């Protein structure tokens, strides 16, 4: 039986007994206390029975309870992981999150694990566990691979034809979201500006016009992620068996469900109308070219239900908006910190545009220096310290004889500082463009390329299916911002510190940047 189910049943039973006069309030409190304690011990026993025996890092005293170690990991995840990588160089160790133990394995195992089927080690189960799918509502992704299939077979192959659409929406978004800076430098929240640019572009590609300019949809797609992550940030600090008890007490939990209802109210009628329009056979019918339409086209009758498609659209917004926003924000911070890169990048953008005469996929592909700059920015400011997270579904024996028991949550260090090699902490924006000049390595060092040493998008069959769209979107946004604006930090400030929440790294969203429209703006050359 599932301890989570036990807790709900026992609490309901206690309430019924109280209503019948069988328990006083004191006895109810005692019954609940005993239940919680018993469930904790059961949960701990089950976890221990399934656990891979490995040293646990982050413990300060031998008698220290694990929940305290897990609580510290939520704030000092980088320190715990660095301790483990230093003490057990190229070895295996554990870190404690309060909702689970994570077994950290060296990246040398990636090549033999990435091809194993989902029935052996599951990426989707790890995503559900990390993002608390039951409480964030992303568990709909377990119902099928519709989103992955459409991203891989429809979005990525059509990126070339979508470039003019993306550029058009970006231009519109910049006029809507960036305040007028013609006269002087303006102090702005650059993260917030980028967030709304990304949300608008993503909406144009995902749901098309006119919905992409529906302010309620844009707000919902942004807030959903914020509400979901606030919910999981709180629940992750608690043992798993407490999640069904605490979640309904959180305002953010209910906000997630309100966001979902809003998404269904906006998107479901569009799905029904599109289906009816296509079925009508009208001569003037023109099928939309966006992710929603591709989902309608290939979905099974079950997956194609309007409410389910609306739900998937909202979850895809969660995946697309904030990680892309962070990548662009970090790159802008690095341009402020290292302004010597600005002019070489502008020259590359200008040269690429002159060769193609317009914004095209090939235009962005030519920008090796910009691609390198973004990759270097990500190297020093990764979105997560861990990647390649999997749940072992049946015991797996590695090539060196290491046996991973069923139920083990495994991961690999993604941040280069954790990968057991000499770490260069200096910023070298063109590091990867130089490496791409070597024979046979033109593709190896691209921003969207994955391998055992570059895991920010995952690796293998379950690498991020939208990473190519993200890479082109990031380059498109940075190119336009660079050509039209100058940036610098306000006097007395510098690149903001990064916050740690478990293994996730987050920029300070309150960071201010001075922004000024260039008098010699290349706006006219950007078409």
UniProtKB/Swiss-Prot annotation:
Name the principal localization, coarsely classed. membrane
Please report the record's description of how this protein sits within the membrane.
Answer: Single-pass membrane protein
Q: What happens when the gene is disrupted?
A: Abolishes the production of 15-deoxyoxalicine B and accumulates decaturin D and decaturin G.
| Subcellular location field | Membrane
Offer an example of a GO molecular function term for this protein.
Answer: heme binding
Instruction: List residues binding heme.
Output: 464
What is any one GO biological process for this UniProt entry? terpenoid biosynthetic process
Q: Name one Pfam family in it.
A: p450
From which domain of life does this come? Eukaryota
Query: Where are its TM segments located?
Result: 21-43
What InterPro entries does the record tag this protein with?
Cyt_P450 (IPR001128), Cyt_P450_E_grp-IV (IPR002403), Cyt_P450_sf (IPR036396)
| This protein's pathway | Secondary metabolite biosynthesis; terpenoid biosynthesis
One CC-aspect GO term: membrane
**What are the EC numbers?**
1.-.-.-
Tell me, what does this protein do in biology?
Answer: Cytochrome P450 monooxygenase; part of the gene cluster that mediates the biosynthesis of 15-deoxyoxalicine B. The first step of the pathway is the synthesis of nicotinyl-CoA from nicotinic acid by the nicotinic acid-CoA ligase olcI. Nicotinyl-CoA is then a substrate of polyketide synthase olcA to produce 4-hydroxy-6-(3-pyridinyl)-2H-pyran-2-one (HPPO) which is further prenylated by the polyprenyl transferase olcH to yield geranylgeranyl-HPPO. Geranylgeranyl pyrophosphate is provided by the cluster-specific geranylgeranyl pyrophosphate synthase olcC.
Q: Give the free-text miscellaneous remark of the entry.
A: The 15-deoxyoxalicine B cluster is a rare cluster that contains its own geranylgeranyl pyrophosphate synthase (olcC), in contrast to other related clusters which rely on a FPP/GGPP synthase localized outside of the cluster.
Recorded hits in PANTHER family, A to Z, give: CYTOCHROME P450 (PTHR46206), CYTOCHROME P450 MONOOXYGENASE AN1598-RELATED (PTHR46206:SF6)
Q: Which family does it belong to?
A: Belongs to the cytochrome P450 family.
What is this protein identified as?
Cytochrome P450 monooxygenase olcJ
């Amino acid at each position: 039986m599932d301890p989570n189910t036990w807790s709900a049943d026992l609490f309901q039973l206690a309430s019924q007994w109280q209503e019948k006069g069988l328990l006083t309030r004191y006895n109810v409190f005692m019954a609940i206390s005993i239940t919680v304690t018993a469930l904790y011990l059961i949960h701990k026993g089950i976890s221990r029975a399934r656990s891979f025996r490995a040293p646990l890092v982050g413990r300060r005293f031998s008698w220290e309870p694990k929940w305290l170690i897990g609580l510290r990991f939520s704030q000092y995840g980088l320190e715990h992981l660095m301790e483990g990588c230093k003490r057990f160089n190229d070895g295996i160790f554990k870190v404690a999150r309060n909702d689970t133990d994570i077994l950290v394995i060296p990246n040398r195992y990636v090549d033999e694990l990435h091809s194993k089927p989902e029935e052996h080690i599951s990426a989707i189960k790890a995503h559900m566990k990390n993002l608390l799918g039951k409480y964030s509502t992303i568990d709909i992704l377990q119902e099928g691979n519709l989103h992955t299939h459409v991203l891989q077979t429809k979005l990525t192959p059509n990126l070339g034809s979508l470039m003019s659409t993306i550029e058009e929406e970006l231009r519109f978004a910049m006029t809507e979201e960036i305040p007028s800076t013609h006269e002087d430098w303006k102090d702005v929240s650059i993260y917030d500006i980028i967030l709304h640019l990304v949300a608008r572009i993503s909406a144009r590609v995902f749901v098309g016009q006119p919905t992409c300019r529906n302010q309620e949809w844009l707000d919902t797609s942004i807030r959903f992620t914020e509400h979901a992550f606030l919910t999981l940030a709180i629940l992750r600090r608690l043992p798993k068996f407490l999640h069904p008890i605490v979640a309904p007490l959180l305002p953010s939990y209910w906000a997630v469900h309100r966001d979902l209802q809003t998404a269904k109210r906006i998107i479901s009628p569009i799905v029904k109308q599109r289906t009816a329009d296509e079925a009508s056979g009208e001569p003037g019918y023109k099928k939309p070219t966006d992710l929603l339409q591709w989902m309608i086209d290939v979905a099974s009758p079950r997956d194609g239900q309007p409410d389910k498609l609306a739900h998937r659209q909202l979850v895809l917004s969660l995946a697309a908006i904030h990680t892309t926003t962070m990548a662009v924000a970090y790159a802008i911070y690095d341009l402020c910190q290292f302004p010597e890169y600005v002019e070489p990048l502008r020259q590359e953008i200008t040269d690429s545009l002159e060769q193609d005469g317009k914004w095209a996929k090939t235009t962005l592909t030519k920008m090796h220096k910009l691609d390198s700059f973004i990759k270097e920015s990500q190297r020093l400011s990764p979105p997560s310290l861990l990647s390649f997270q999997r749940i072992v579904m049946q015991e797996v024996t590695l090539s060196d004889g290491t046996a991973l028991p069923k139920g083990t949550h495994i991961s690999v260090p993604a941040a280069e500082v954790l990968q057991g090699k000499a770490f260069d902490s200096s910023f070298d924006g063109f590091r990867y463009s130089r490496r791409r000049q070597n024979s046979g390595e033109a593709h190896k060092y691209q921003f969207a390329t994955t391998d055992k040493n570059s895991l920010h998008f995952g690796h293998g069959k379950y690498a991020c299916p939208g990473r190519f769209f993200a890479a082109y979107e990031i380059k498109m946004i940075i190119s336009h911002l660079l050509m039209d604006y100058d940036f610098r930090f306000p006097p007395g400030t510098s690149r903001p510190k990064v916050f740690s929440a478990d293994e996730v790294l987050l920029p300070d969203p309150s960071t201010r940047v001075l922004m000024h429209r260039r008098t010699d703006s290349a706006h006219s050359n950007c078409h």
